[in-house]
Amino acid sequence: MRIYIWLILLNAPPIRTDIYLDLVRQGASPAYSKIRNDTFRTLATDPLFRRRVTENSLTRVLNAVAWKLNDAHEARVNGWQSPPTLSDFGDTPESAYQSRHSFATSARTDASTSEAEQVGYVQGMNVLAAPFLYAARSEVEAFVAFERLITRECPGYVRGSMDGVHKGLKLVDTVLEIVDPKLFAHLMSKGMHAEIYAFASVLTMCACTPPLPEVLQLWDFLFAYGPHLNILCIVAQLILIRDKIIDSPR
């Protein structure tokens, strides 16, 4: 039930299974070696995840998403009306028109986008995809939800420069300074900017922080009210352990 609620909250329409299978049949994407370097260690110490999700399943979903992002980038650069793996992507005629229009607009405005600004596979996407596979009843559902999240909700997180993540980290520092100036000053005195301790939490929307069942409940909240609220959740985690942080001799 959870995955269907997530799909609704993410406004992610279903797709035909054969569309996902076509992406899988394309074989190794340009990012495949990076994906394989990450998948084997994804939530490796979480027995619940390891029992339900196989490495091969995670690899297929990430590789399919990498192909879709690659084709979307080529569409922007070449000005295609509809990239090969995006056509008939389960959309209604109206949404398909909007998709084609957005690609045409992007082609006019973003054709000169540098490699650092391209949306593609980056390290950490494996952890971000993991809860979707854990909650989903099929790879297709996980693929649709994950792809929708990274392309519509937080595309800045998966650009080569990860500019969205770095902006989020600055927000963690800013919010913490407002909410708890003493804790913020203590961390700054130790040289502990959010870039050092909160990078993974921002990038993965706290999926890197066990236990997994609590991550799923957190995501229920984030998808309902906005993934940007993850910044406040990270600060809340710091507040919960503030005494331990301040009393720590290091």
Where are these regions (language model features)?
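Internal, helix-rich recognition cores of eukaryotic regulatory domains
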Residues: 1-250
